[in-house]
């Protein structure tokens, strides 16, 4: 099986530069002249973007993206993309090329966030059962396990799918296959230490109770599903129910929720690792704005991949 896929070349369902600029101006009430000043371009350049449909150069597009993420509530942008895209779950289930691209990219990025040294090409080789030089066997297991977990996720997730305890444990069992010391499919029996938070994690005795409470609320989305899913992701990571694999399982749960609600999957990329962990740390202090924006950015990357 061939996975002829790049890491960053995602050109599917996106907002145009013109749409992003309009949202920036609406959110900030700045004039075209002020926007030109902030982007360090001429007024005529902004005029061409907005009124003549001229596309910005790559460097200019990056500057526009930066302002867009800084000033615009990305939930609205995600909802707009949702209207443009019919049933991302169906696309992933029915289009093999897009499904393979999703599984490869998601596996590479999610494992890299957790410290894997595998490149995307090496991840592809692992999927194909080919030899991967200069990598530990456990890194190859991690890649294949994550692929299998995503296939299980896509096989089982439906519109309106309900997260259950058994589903979470099964995801962990697949992610930790061949890592018996990590208790695949079972909660941790001791304490764990995290380096990126000062918040005390629940004791192993409290984990089943905390997960039980999590399950009771996880399928109730209210009127703002994006914010709820972002909060749920933080809450799961704050419970940290397993000895290992919490981040990977947590991101798989988030993807399951998003697909079941008609959104594209959230793809947290390795280059956003610091921003991702910072958003979780801020949520420790009760500030959820960053984790919501981070979730939205990752969903938008999912929409890019679907095209």
Task: Briefly describe each language-model feature range.
Residues 1-244, 248-307:
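FIC/Doc superfamily catalytic core
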């Amino acid at each position: 099986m061939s996975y002829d896929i790049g890491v960053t070349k995602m050109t599917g369902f996106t907002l145009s530069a013109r749409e992003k600029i309009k949202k920036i101006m609406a959110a900030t009430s700045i004039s075209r002249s002020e926007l030109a000043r902030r982007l360090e371009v001429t007024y005529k350049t902004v005029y061409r973007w907005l009124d003549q449909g001229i596309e910005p150069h790559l460097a200019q597009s990056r500057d526009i993206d930066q302002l867009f993420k800084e000033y615009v509530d990305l939930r609205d942008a995600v909802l707009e993309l949702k209207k443009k895209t019919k049933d991302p779950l169906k696309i992933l289930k029915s289009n093999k090329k897009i499904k393979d691209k999703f599984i490869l990219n998601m596996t590479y990025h999610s494992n890299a966030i957790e410290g894997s040294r595998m490149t995307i090409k090496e991840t592809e080789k692992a999927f194909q059962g080919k030899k991967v030089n200069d990598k530990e066997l456990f890194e190859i297991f991690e890649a294949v396990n994550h692929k299998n977990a995503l296939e299980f996720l896509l096989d089982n997730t439906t519109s309106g799918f309900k997260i259950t305890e058994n589903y979470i444990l099964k995801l962990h069992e697949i992610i930790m296959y061949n890592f018996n010391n990590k208790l695949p499919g079972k909660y941790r029996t001791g304490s764990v230490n995290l380096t990126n938070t000062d918040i005390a994690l629940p004791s192993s005795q409290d984990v089943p109770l905390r997960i039980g409470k999590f399950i009771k609320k996880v399928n109730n989305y209210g009127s703002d599903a994006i914010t709820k899913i972002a909060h749920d992701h933080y809450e799961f990571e704050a419970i940290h129910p397993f000895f290992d694999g919490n981040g990977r399982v947590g991101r798989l749960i988030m993807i399951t929720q998003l697909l079941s609600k008609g959104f594209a999957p959230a793809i947290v990329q390795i280059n956003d690792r610091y921003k991702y962990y910072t958003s979780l740390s801020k949520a420790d202090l009760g500030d959820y704005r960053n984790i919501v924006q981070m979730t939205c950015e990752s969903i938008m990357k999912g929409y890019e991949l679907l095209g």
